[in-house]
Amino acid sequence: LSYLFQAAFLLGLTTCIFLVADFYSSDEATLRLLLGFIPWVSLVLVPALAMSAWTDGQADREMELTYSLPISPPAIVMGKFVAGYLLLLLTLAFTLPFAVTVAYLGEPDLGVVVAGYLACALLLGACFAVSLLAAALVREVVGAFVAGIAALFLMMLCGWDVFGRLLRTVLPQWTWETLSAYSPVTWLNQLGEGVIRPQSLVYFGLTVAAALLVTHWVVEQRRRGGLTRLFLGTRLARLVALCLIWLLGIPLAANLPGQIDLTAEKEFSLHAGTKQVLERLPEGTQVTLYWSETGDTIPASIKSHARRIQRLLASMSTRSTLEWNLVNPEPDTEQELQAMARGIHRVPMSSGDHFFLGLTVEQGGRLGRIPYLDIRRESLLEYDVVQAMNGLTRKS
């Protein structure tokens, strides 16, 4: 069955990347498609790998035999996790020809490729740990498979940008930001950009540890004859405490200092002059990025440039009081009129369509702008954005 799982995983991933997303016409030498599809392939296939881990039916007395051996429940849980995780890592290693293909067709950032595979490895570990927990709670094979998919789907959904855009229309921005911090997709994407921050490692570490610990408690109680006692007295208290540690530990980890920037251009490492400008920024400085993110005909190079701009603004906001938001000025909307009224250029394309990619900086009634963030000035991106902010600082 291991070979069948690996074949299904690789076939599903290959189909998504090369047929669904049409990799060869994407004009982009990155692992973005791999990072985009691996959560959804894992959503279905990782629970399939874990669903029979704790079954003990009439035809399969594996667990009964295991319990009769002088092996502690923690060792059993860790053994099953390590065995399954090694299989997942081996399967991930079989995707390396895709990275070789990307390197042959273009010049990918090696640091970003390494970070992307690290992100995939951590994602698979978290998915497998959660799937093992679901299988331990349900035990019946089909039920364990469905429970694993349901648990992973809820976690993936919180980090899905499409769901986020829908949620932002009915709930405040902070609600989506809070929910997305508990999704593995959020941290997969962040690591895949080429930066390793403590919070992403804390998320995956806490998620795997919490899932395996609860799995151990469930297996231990089943070994003693019943699961109901897990939700009584001190056992319930420790379960609640573990949930609180997971819920509070992830957002608190944002305060941990340091990061490892693996990108070749050190996109996440701000220059000393930039840091000085950010320190002088007055309270309430607001940056609004106008970007036509839903445009289907926009070249991949422009989309990649826009993602880099968003990463730069996010990095700046974490190191200062700067606030920023993204506005998508779709045609014939109020957002498009707002962008044009603020001096953001509408850039035409050969297809006849157009797009916006500019920003405004506001503070105390004063307004600075970059009408178009030209990709030809990509190497001066940080300088251009800082100059727009520094203009407000000088005026103050």
State where each predicted segment sits.
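Aromatic-anchored segments of alpha-helical transmembrane domains
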Residues: 11-18, 98, 151-162, 248-252
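Transmembrane helix boundary and interhelical loop/hinge segments in multi-pass membrane proteins
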Residues: 30, 49-67, 81
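Terminal transmembrane helical anchor/hairpin motif
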Residues: 23-28, 144-218, 222-225
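Secretory targeting signals
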Residues: 16-18, 25-28, 41, 79-144
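Membrane-interface helix starts
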Residues: 1-8
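Long, hydrophobic alpha-helical segments
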Residues: 34-56
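Short, surface-exposed patches at the edges or C-terminal ends of soluble domains, predominantly
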Residues: 22, 164, 189-198, 207-212, ...
